[in-house]
Curated annotation (Swiss-Prot):
Belongs to the class-I aminoacyl-tRNA synthetase family. Signal peptide: none annotated. Keywords: Aminoacyl-tRNA synthetase, ATP-binding, Cytoplasm, Ligase, Nucleotide-binding, Protein biosynthesis. This is Arginine--tRNA ligase. It is found in: Cytoplasm. A motif ('HIGH' region) lies at residues 122-132. It catalyses: tRNA(Arg) + L-arginine + ATP = L-arginyl-tRNA(Arg) + AMP + diphosphate. CDD domains: Anticodon_Ia_Arg, ArgRS_core. Pfam families: Arg_tRNA_synt_N, DALR_1, tRNA-synt_1d. Monomer. GO terms for cellular component: cytoplasm. The keyword ATP-binding applies. GO terms for biological process: arginyl-tRNA aminoacylation.
Amino acid sequence: MNIQALLSEKVRQAMIAAGAPADCEPQVRQSAKVQFGDYQANGMMAVAKKLGMAPRQLAEQVLTHLDLNGIASKVEIAGPGFINIFLDPAFLAEHVQQALASDRLGVSTPEKQTIVVDYSAPNVAKEMHVGHLRSTIIGDAAVRTLEFLGHKVIRANHVGDWGTQFGMLIAWLEKQQQENAGEMELADLEGFYRDAKKHYDEDEEFAERARNYVVKLQSGDEYFREMWHKLVDITMTQNQITYDRLNVTLTRDDVMGESLYNPMLPGIVADLKAKGLAVESEGATVVFLDEFKNKEGEPMGVIIQKKDGGYLYTTTDIACAKYRYETLHADRVLYYIDSRQHQHLMQAWAIVRKAGYVPESVPLEHHMFGMMLGKDGKPFKTRAGGTVKLADLLDEALERARRLVAEKNPDMPADELEKLANAVGIGAVKYADLSKNRTTDYIFDWDNMLAFEGNTAPYMQYAYTRVLSVFRKAEINEEQLAAAPVIIREDREAQLAARLLQFEETLTVVAREGTPHVMCAYLYDLAGLFSGFYEHCPILSAENEEVRNSRLKLAQLTAKTLKLGLDTLGIETVERM
């Protein structure tokens, strides 16, 4: 249930009855402080100004029309015209019951959309590195959230699987008599890539052969296509191991590489010319965009075909957006690509809109993100200054978590310890990233992310096991609790219940904005509220069985919400720690 949406509609109707225009915004928000109630309507100031009246006067008139019977126990005006809404304990109790009776914890299903999510996008013949982490896990959290809400989500792994480097790689593999690329590890390919590049730069005969191979590959020659497929297969097989370790939902079926759009490129260039959007300029084909200016203040030229006939990333991105609308029937397209690509995407999309390939009614959203930095505030590197491989980072996370878990659980069986270390280590790396606003850079710090205090994966995983332990001590199962009523009398019970019922609102924000840190903040706050509730409202030693069972049900919904919330982030939970 979305209480914010329910209250927004109630307040809006009351505002209209009080003389506000039909398009008025009630601006109902969750209250920042307990003394201001559970929700606050802040829209009176803006509307009162339009009506030429005092905000408090409008708020008083709104209250005469506002019917929150059975929802709120108290409604009051604060300050210049804020309306504070205190939820009725009986309303909270009823909806806690309903949430517990639902597999979805009472979360409603919005109108279903087809949403394409572009994320991860590693390059073929290169191992994934830390630069791929943010796109991969933030994008996957968005996908999990959207799917839970009931949308049809199409994962699009825009793999870099095309370009001149493939002629170079195939030529070098051939030279080394290692055409049977299927038996090679990706680590070998990285070495081959370096060696191939070195030969390409130093040996003109080799470079010429590589260029010829590119032409043959692009013309569809069977032998070269087969070699190219092998390179792609090895890369994606290795990447799948990383995805599985990260508990990310991407599979080989989700690969939609750059090569997919190659057949579309000549037609797009011809169409843009025919529509008068693209012109010849110094031998290249260019689209001039009034929205973007060059240093001289003139419309910026975006090249879509080079003088030699080659295409650019922009051309591919135009084709990509067109394909996602026309072929995949997207209602919405989300791109999890770092902030440095923003202008490039905006230019490609400006051309897409002008050409009529994707209507304005279909949002193209760049959910950009900042960089992962080391403690020195510079891009995260190895001690030698090299790029950190993602597999190496996950290995270190596992090793550090293994030591941490073994220290706290010296008698734990080896297999259980390994499972726990994996959940904690991988969870720590992911949660440290997901808990930060994606638009900002963040400092990668092992000590902070593996701490059992603060907004970290280990703390959240421990909070979940702590709630479960209450049930183990109670020696009661879910079926026995089902018939028991929920009764809310204490303030801490009400605060916990209200926060539990804000789960859907949190999911809605994450789905709309692509900001998993909002879910992390919600779960951390929920864990803190449960801690206060547990301390001040005895559960197992409650004054009677009715109160005991009611509090057990609040604990039960807390556990289910923590688990489901962490699952939308791709963070594994464990039963014991």
